[in-house]
Regions:
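Bacterial N-terminal signal peptides
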Residues: 1-7
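Short loop/turn and low-complexity linker motifs enriched in small/turn-promoting residues
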Residues: 12-137
């Protein structure tokens, strides 16, 4: 199920963590948080204006509406911002890809997908492509 999409521009200082528990989720149990997986092609640099730097890992986050500032590392000219409502006990993946936009131009698209726990644990580009096809039907 497609949750939401894009917009642009920001720089951030580097903060790293393997598994990041977003501050508003620190006192919540596993069943009370949403799990956001960050694909290897995306760097999450901000959640609700709080600076982070997470790439290819997962974030345990309090449920609710969140705004993310993200960046595709290999594409310096495109930064993105998106928002999504995350629910407790559910799994999401933040991913990106490009589409032709005419001539030499292309558009960078960021999306948050809800996935099953199994798909989350085995997440890869093949799973994303299947989700994109399903979201268009």
């Amino acid at each position: 199920m497609l949750i939401l999409v894009l917009s642009f521009q920001l720089n951030a200082k580097k903060i790293t963590n393997k598994v990041l528990v977003y501050s508003t989720a620190e006192n919540l149990t596993k069943e009370e948080v949403a799990v956001l997986g960050i694909s290897k092609d995306v760097t999450l640099i901000e959640i609700n204006k709080s600076k982070f730097k997470v790439n290819g890992d997962r974030v345990y986050i309090a449920p609710g509406r969140h705004t993310f500032q993200v960046k595709k590392p290999l594409s310096i000219t495109y930064d993105g911002e998106l928002s999504a409502t995350l629910e407790a006990g559910k799994y999401y993946v933040l991913d990106t890809w490009t589409e032709p936009a005419g001539g030499r131009y292309y558009r960078v698209i960021y999306k948050v997908f809800e996935v099953s726990e199994g798909d989350f644990e085995n997440y890869n580009r093949k799973v994303l492509n299947m989700l994109i096809i399903l979201s268009k039907n």
